[in-house]
């Protein structure tokens, strides 16, 4: 059946399906009976896969257990089945065992033995809390009368004395305290007389028996005592005890510890136990407390009491919901001659509802019990005095109106006194009835005229009468006639609203007036116990309260526990309202609201249908069957358990008729005080403060499409905690309210998806579509995961294959190169002569030095889609940018001062880089770092080796197929270069710009350039003739022990420039350091033929040459020329820079210490990440501060850089003019160089180990004839530039010039500029939108690349870094170079580099990559085809022609991934030629979610072979064309 209107047709179908399922459950419940009802409900919930929040799930199970414990036991069942049901109701842990004499029920707290003989119960014994069994006659009577339900409820009530949810130690403490309390009460409160009940310390204690807890009677009404005395009874019997109020003492769980006494035989409480419980005082009826008394008790109680409702203390007894004006009451004395009393009560004390009806009170110490009893007696007496007036003024049922004489009395109500005013013949009088002592009132009459008491004897008489009768009207009858009060005629009874129902015993005391027949009948009637039940512990006490008057016929049934609304209480309650309280409309079920699916439910339109759909409450519950009654109560139990959904999804709505009422707990543990916001130490505020209790914060509802996108890991049915998870299950929504069906079972419950049923049962036909959809979704998710795993595996395999291919190619190239060099050493010697380079201050045109770089890290190029595939598992150094094409074994293992850290990588690269460092690089570095060289021994070895002739190996070609040998060579070379006393070669001198070196060189060139040129040419010729017979081979010989390793690995040179020269303003070119000491073995190998001069350790570097060539080191320094420059004035540089070099040496030492500290931090970073996260945060902050400091330095440098802009333009103009003549001088220059190559090669090999490469930032070549301008430029050049422009521009400015693949294989310094330009930056980068493709513009005349592009190769003579200034102010005409021999495209000219300003200086123009013979072509080559990463090519051609102006600023790209050569040593400068390209290396599949890198343009095999053979001096890949020559300027 459809019980509500929905907008969606699909929702209507589901609603019908839910109703059919619930109806099936009802039918099954009838068929199976109540024994299997809980099982049926549970199975139904599981089959429907409802998902409930954890707390609500517990509520449902608790509700089922509660129903099971309170459902009536069927009397038609067999005896064994009844006993089994009895045991089930006593707890889950009860064990039923049959023995010879009957059946026993045992649990931890109770034992019941039922004797059976001939199918009849003959005996019953019960033992509680581990005590021995005792006979239970009352229990036996119930069993014989077939009242198993009552017996079960009675035993459960006794067991509730000690809570079940506390710990075992606390439970034992409670048992001991209960025993001690009962011992004391039985001893001190055994007197059952009425006087003892009122005056004893504890009153009268009725001990606990087998069916009920102990009861403590604390007060007896005087009128009841008078009735009993008339019967001749001085002690209370059972008939009287049933009418007397009492309290029961329980223990309840608490968060605070209480003092519990320890039992002893003496009964003295000397020792106590601490337990997280508190003493609960449960009243027979709700006790009426005034706000004044509550405030006094709040100081001693550990927690707030359980309040049934907030009322007005005085108005509550009258039965009037509101009193708008003064209340008028007229007594109804029976005799006509009696003077009636007309009370006019002030309404100010009848307005506020600040008093409370308390169900349970709590104590923290049992020693406070006497004080509490005394307070209860005082409060009771005060209420009785007021109720005596109200009761005496109630008219009889058959009363008729008549005229009576009455005295007018003005009554003012207060908690401690009653103040009366009346007129007498002697004037106005006032009577004060005050409580001087607890339960002891005194009356004092005062004349308002005189202020004196008319008669003290009258006051004493009135006091005695009042304390004996507890009735103000009876006491006043003795005063009105004596004081001659003025009387008025009134009609009796007064016309005031009569209550529809008689007063309950907790509202009025009936027995003081025996003349009233109505009240006399009530005195002998048993007072019904009122039970207030909490439905669901998660609901605030005020939100769900159901009460009903207990019915004798339904006693012990389910209805007696759940209860109905008290009709009288609904009409008379004034809680939170000033007007009559009508019966409120019942709110929708909580479970139904949680199961709502439509967020657009129109509440206004459906309100009426929902109200009709709500099950009507039966008028007469006695007519209902047990099944129907249980259905109603089951709805209340289960539905209330889901009320959290309503509180969480919607605004607060009180769900029941008692929504304004706090509730009282029933016979089980109460949830706590009605107002949870009131602490125990704070007195009760007004009821208005409790209009709304603590509520859950609403949580976001699940959207309709969220379920499909739910993570597969949690499962479709898994929900988060909270209301959103409760209500929004399986595609449903929990916004809105639906009506209830007439049977109380909510038609839509949220799915219960347990661990074994995370998804709907596929065997259920109704769930097949959902299950299929879910399986399809899961299958898609698995496919996606498998695809990702496959891609990752394929990527890893390709990375491995790529590494192997690269290593094989490098190995093959080096072998071919070795063979070619062995076969034609002279040709190789002539061809590779100008491979080495020297850099001076003139190598850079910018005034910026790169900032200090952070710790060395390895790029995790895997995460960069635009990068070539990295060497993930190879040597970590392979991943460095600028790595030459060499074997992975040919790598430096000892971090030397020249090994500057590369650029910091992105966070995604961090993990990969640190792992590689820890595994290989730094661990190997630890082996040789602490070994100090033996200088004397080295000198001896060098002297001995000088006679044999030096054999120097090249840098890149020294790597062989033997990994260990290559590694040793590399170590030896690096160790030699990092020796503290080793002096770097003078030819590689790189003084800092700030030292004025450029100006000094300009002066020296202008004076001695011509003389030095001739002198050097002569010396070169001499050396060439002397060493012609034993000229050394460029490739390493098989005798590796007789030759040093490569002078310096490219990455080391790069790092040394980044560290030693790149980010210190005044740092010199000296790379000496005393902190890092290479191993002795490596020094011995590398310095076998090198002369060390220890006399000048801190000065500028000198050239170390074989001793057999020159007699002294000083002479060697003066005589060594670069192979490609015949005129140099570098000889005197060391003397000029000695003072500055010492300062540079100090700075170098500081940098070395910083580098060591950074390296140690890198080595322990992984451990820090695991051990101390806060330490990593701190380190990160320090690095941020360092980066900010560098940014500030670059910002300051930017300001100084701007001042040199004018000089740059003028200087560049002169450069272009000079570069036009370069090609003319090139042929002559080559011819001259061939004559003395061997000697220059020999000198170069000794120089290379210490070649300090310049930063090459913002590279430019100043003019030769601007000596005065050059003096000014070094000042500006030493200042670091801004992080956004100058620093970033280095990426393109310092890009390498074209170099052959053989060069990149054999050169240890050639790829230096790539690392410099791509990895030495640590600041911000400009946007990547400035990446441009090479323009289609014809390039300038072809010549060597800009100086600084290459540091030269290890097997060739050094290229003088200052040869540009060799001419005298530019007056010398340089020699003209011959044209290239092969019809192949040559490298770009330095003219082009000078013209291309900004960030692109350092890259050849687009014409270098197109066409042939240096002519511009129309075809545009992609950046990856140029040997560059994507986006690194020259900018695209503009429509108007040349893309670059002399002063044009080209912004470098933003991201490092387009600048770096991570893991791609072959991606050096562009190697595009007209020959066939070789197949490309295997590409790596990029990670998901990123774009794959563009494929590399595969160079052809013939081209690689040509490069391996050398191809001639004038080939396109020739070092002569691939390296900038400076001397012809």
UniProtKB/Swiss-Prot annotation:
This is Mediator of RNA polymerase II transcription subunit 1.1. Residues 1051-1061, 1068-1089, 1096-1105 have a biased composition (Polar residues). It is found in: Nucleus. Residues 1008-1032, 1169-1202 form a coiled coil. Belongs to the Mediator complex subunit 1 family. Residues 908-919, 1113-1130, 1137-1185, 1192-1240, 1262-1278, 1289-1304 have a biased composition (Basic and acidic residues). GO terms for cellular component: nucleus. It comes from the Eukaryota. Signal peptide: none annotated. Residues 894-905, 1375-1386, 1477-1500 have a biased composition (Pro residues). InterPro entries: m6A_RNA_Methylation_Regulator. Component of the Mediator complex, a coactivator involved in the regulated transcription of nearly all RNA polymerase II-dependent genes. Mediator functions as a bridge to convey information from gene-specific regulatory proteins to the basal RNA polymerase II transcription machinery. Mediator is recruited to promoters by direct interactions with regulatory proteins and serves as a scaffold for the assembly of a functional preinitiation complex with RNA polymerase II and the general transcription factors. The keyword Transcription regulation applies. Keywords: Activator, Coiled coil, Nucleus, Transcription, Transcription regulation. It comes from Caenorhabditis briggsae. Residues 722-739, 807-828, 958-990, 1008-1023, 1279-1288, 1349-1365 have a biased composition (Low complexity). Its main location: nucleus. Residues 685-740, 807-919, 933-1529 are annotated as: Disordered. Component of the Mediator complex.
């Amino acid at each position: 059946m459809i019980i509500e209107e929905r907008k969606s047709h699909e929702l209507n179908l589901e609603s019908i399906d839910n109703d059919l399922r619930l109806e099936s459950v009802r039918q099954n419940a009838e068929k199976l009976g109540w024994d299997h009802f809980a099982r049926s409900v549970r199975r139904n919930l599981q089959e429907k896969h409802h998902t409930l929040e954890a707390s609500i799930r517990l509520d449902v199970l608790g509700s089922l257990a509660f129903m099971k414990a309170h459902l009536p036991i069927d009397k038609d069942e067999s005896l064994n089945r009844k006993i089994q049901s009895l045991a089930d109701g006593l707890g889950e842990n009860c064990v039923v065992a049959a023995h010879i004499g009957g059946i026993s029920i045992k649990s931890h707290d109770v034992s019941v033995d039922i004797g059976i003989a001939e199918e009849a119960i003959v005996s019953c014994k019960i033992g509680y809390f581990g005590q021995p069994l005792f006979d239970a006659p009352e229990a036996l009577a119930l069993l014989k009368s077939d009242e198993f339900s009552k017996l079960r409820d009675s035993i459960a009530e006794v067991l509730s004395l000690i809570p079940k949810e506390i710990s075992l130690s606390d439970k034992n403490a409670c048992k001991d305290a209960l025993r001690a309390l009962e011992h004391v009460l039985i001893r001190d409160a055994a007197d059952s007389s009425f006087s003892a009940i009122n005056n004893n310390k504890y009153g009268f204690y009725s001990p606990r028996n087998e069916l009920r807890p102990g009861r403590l009677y604390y007060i007896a009404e005087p009128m009841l005592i008078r009735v009993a005395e008339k019967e001749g009874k001085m002690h209370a019997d059972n008939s009287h005890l049933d009418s007397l109020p009492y309290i029961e003492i329980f223990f309840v769980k608490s968060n605070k510890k209480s003092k519990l006494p320890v039992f002893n035989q003496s009964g003295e409480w000397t020792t106590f136990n601490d337990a997280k419980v508190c003493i609960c005082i449960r009243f027979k009826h709700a006790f009426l407390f005034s706000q004044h008394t509550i405030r006094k008790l709040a100081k001693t109680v550990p927690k707030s009491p359980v309040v049934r409702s907030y009322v007005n203390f005085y108005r509550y007894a009258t039965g009037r919901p509101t009193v708008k004006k003064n209340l008028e009451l007229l007594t109804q004395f029976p005799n006509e001659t009696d003077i009636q009393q007309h009370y006019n009560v002030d309404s100010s004390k009848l307005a506020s509802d600040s008093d409370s009806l308390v169900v349970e009170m709590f104590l923290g110490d049992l020693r406070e019990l006497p004080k509490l009893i005394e307070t209860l007696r005082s409060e009771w007496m005060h209420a009785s005095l007021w109720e005596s007036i109200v009761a005496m003024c109630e008219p009889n049922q058959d009363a008729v109106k008549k005229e009576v004489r009455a005295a007018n009395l003005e009554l003012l109500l207060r908690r401690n006194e009653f103040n009366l005013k009346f007129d007498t013949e002697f004037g106005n009088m006032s009577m004060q009835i005050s409580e001087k002592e607890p339960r002891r009132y005194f009356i004092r009459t005062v004349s308002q005229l005189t202020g004196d008491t008319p008669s003290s004897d009258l006051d004493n008489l009135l006091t005695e009468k009042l304390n004996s009768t507890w009735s103000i009207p009876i006491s006043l009858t003795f005063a009105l006639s004596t004081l001659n009060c003025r009387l008025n005629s009134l009609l009796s009874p007064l016309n005031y609203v009569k209550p529809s129902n008689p007063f309950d015993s907790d509202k009025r005391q009936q027995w003081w007036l025996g003349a009233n027949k109505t009240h006399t009948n009530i005195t002998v009637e048993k007072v019904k116990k009122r039970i207030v039940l909490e439905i669901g512990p998660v609901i605030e006490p005020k939100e769900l309260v159901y009460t009903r008057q207990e019915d004798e016929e339904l006693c012990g049934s389910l209805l007696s526990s759940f209860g109905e609304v008290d009709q009288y209480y609904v009409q008379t309650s004034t809680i939170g309202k000033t007007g009559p309280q009508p019966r409120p409309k019942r709110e929708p079920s909580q479970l139904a609201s949680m199961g709502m699916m439509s967020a657009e439910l129109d509440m206004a339109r459906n309100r009426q249908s929902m109200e009709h759909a709500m099950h009507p409450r039966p008028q007469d519950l006695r007519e209902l069957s047990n099944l129907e009654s249980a259905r109603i109560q089951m709805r209340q139990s289960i539905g209330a358990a889901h009320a959290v959904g309503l509180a969480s999804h919607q605004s607060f709505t009180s769900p029941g008729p008692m929504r304004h009422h706090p509730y009282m707990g029933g016979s089980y543990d109460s949830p706590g005080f009605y107002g949870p916001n009131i602490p125990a130490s704070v007195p009760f505020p007004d009821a208005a403060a409790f209009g709304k209790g603590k509520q859950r914060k609403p949580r976001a509802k699940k959207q309709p499409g969220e379920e499909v996108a739910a993570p597969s890991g949690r499962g479709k049915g898994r929900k988060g905690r909270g209301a959103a998870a409760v209500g929004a299950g399986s595609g449903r929504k929990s916004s809105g309210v639906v009506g209830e069906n007439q049977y109380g079972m909510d038609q839509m419950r949220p799915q219960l998806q347990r661990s074994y049923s995370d998804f709907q049962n596929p065997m259920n036909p109704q769930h097949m579509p959902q299950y299929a959809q879910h399986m399809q979704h899961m299958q898609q998710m698995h496919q996606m995961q498998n695809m990702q795993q496959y891609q990752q595996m394929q990527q890893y395999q390709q990375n491995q294959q790529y590494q192997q291919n690269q290593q094989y190619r490098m190995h093959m190239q080096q072998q071919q190169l070795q063979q070619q060099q062995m076969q034609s050493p002279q040709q190789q010697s002539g061809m590779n002569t100008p491979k080495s380079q020297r850099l001076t201050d003139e190598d850079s045109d910018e005034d910026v030095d790169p900032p200090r770089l952070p710790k060395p890290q390895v790029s995790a190029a895997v995460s960069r889609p635009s990068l070539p595939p990295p060497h993930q598992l190879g040597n970590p150094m392979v991943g460095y940018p600028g790595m030459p094409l060499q074997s992975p074994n040919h790598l430096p293992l000892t971090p030397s001062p020249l090994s500057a850290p590369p650029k910091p990588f992105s966070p995604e690269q961090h993990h990969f880089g640190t792992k590689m460092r820890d595994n290989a690089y730094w661990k190997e570095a630890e082996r040789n770092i602490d070994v100090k060289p033996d200088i004397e021994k080295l000198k001896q070895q060098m002297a001995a080796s000088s006679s044999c002739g030096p054999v120097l190996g090249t840098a890149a070609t020294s790597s062989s197929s033997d990994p260990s040998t290559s590694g040793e060579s590399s170590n030896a070379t690096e160790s030699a270069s990092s020796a503290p006393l080793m002096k770097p070669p003078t030819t590689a001198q790189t003084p800092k710009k700030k030292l004025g070196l450029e100006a000094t060189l300009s002066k020296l060139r202008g004076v001695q350039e011509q003389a030095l040129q001739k002198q050097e040419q002569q010396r070169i010729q001499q050396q060439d003739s002397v060493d012609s017979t034993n000229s050394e081979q460029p490739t390493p010989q098989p005798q590796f022990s007789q030759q040093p390793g490569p002078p310096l690995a490219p990455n080391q040179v790069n790092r040394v420039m980044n560290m030693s020269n790149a980010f210190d303003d005044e740092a010199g070119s000296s790379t000496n350091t005393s902190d890092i000491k290479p191993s002795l073995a490596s020094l011995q190998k590398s310095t076998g033929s090198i002369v060390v001069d220890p006399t000048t350790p801190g000065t500028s570097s000198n050239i170390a040459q074989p001793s057999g060539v020159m007699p002294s080191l000083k002479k060697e320094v003066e005589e060594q020329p670069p192979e490609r420059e015949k005129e140099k004035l570098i000889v005197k540089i060391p003397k000029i820079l000695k003072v500055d070099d010492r300062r540079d040496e100090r700075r170098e030492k500081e940098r070395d210490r910083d580098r060591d500290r950074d390296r140690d931090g890198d080595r322990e970073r992984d451990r820090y990440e695991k051990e101390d996260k806060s330490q990593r945060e701190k380190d990160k902050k320090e690095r941020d501060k360092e980066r900010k400091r560098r940014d500030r330095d670059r910002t300051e440098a930017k300001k100084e850089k701007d001042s040199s802009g004018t000089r740059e333009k003028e200087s560049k103009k002169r450069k272009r003019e000079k570069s036009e003549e370069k090609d003319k001088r090139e042929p002559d220059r080559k011819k001259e160089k061939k004559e003395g190559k061997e000697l220059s090669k020999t000198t170069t090999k000794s120089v290379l180990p210490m070649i300090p490469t310049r930063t090459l930032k913002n590279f430019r070549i100043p003019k030769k004839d601007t000596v005065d301008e050059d003096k000014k430029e070094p000042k500006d050049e030493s200042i670091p530039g801004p992080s956004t422009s100058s620093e970033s521009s280095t990426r393109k400015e310092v890009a390498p010039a074209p170099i052959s693949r053989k060069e990149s294989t054999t050169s240890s310094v050639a790829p230096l500029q790539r690392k410099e330009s791509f990895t030495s930056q640590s600041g911000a980068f400009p946007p990547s939108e400035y990446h441009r493709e090479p323009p289609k513009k014809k390039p300038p005349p072809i010549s060597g690349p800009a100086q600084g592009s290459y540091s030269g190769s290890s097997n060739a003579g050094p290229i003088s870094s200052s040869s540009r200034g060799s001419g005298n102010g530019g007056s010398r005409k340089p020699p003209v170079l011959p044209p290239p021999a092969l019809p192949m495209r040559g490298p770009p000219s330095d003219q082009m580099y000078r013209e291309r300003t900004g960030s692109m200086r350092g890259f050849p123009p687009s014409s270098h990559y197109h066409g042939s013979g240096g002519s511009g072509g129309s075809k545009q080559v992609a950046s990856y085809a140029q040997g560059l990463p994507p986006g690194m090519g020259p900018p695209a051609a503009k429509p108007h022609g040349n893309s670059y102006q002399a002063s044009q600023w080209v912004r470098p790209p933003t991201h490092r991934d387009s600048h770096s050569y991570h893991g791609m040593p072959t991606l050096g400068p562009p190697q595009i030629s007209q020959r066939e390209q070789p197949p490309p290396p295997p590409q790596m599949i990029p990670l998901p979610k990123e774009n794959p890198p563009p494929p590399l343009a595969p160079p052809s095999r013939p081209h690689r072979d040509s490069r391996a053979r050398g191809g001639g001096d004038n080939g396109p890949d020739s070092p002569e064309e691939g390296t900038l020559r400076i001397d012809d300027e």
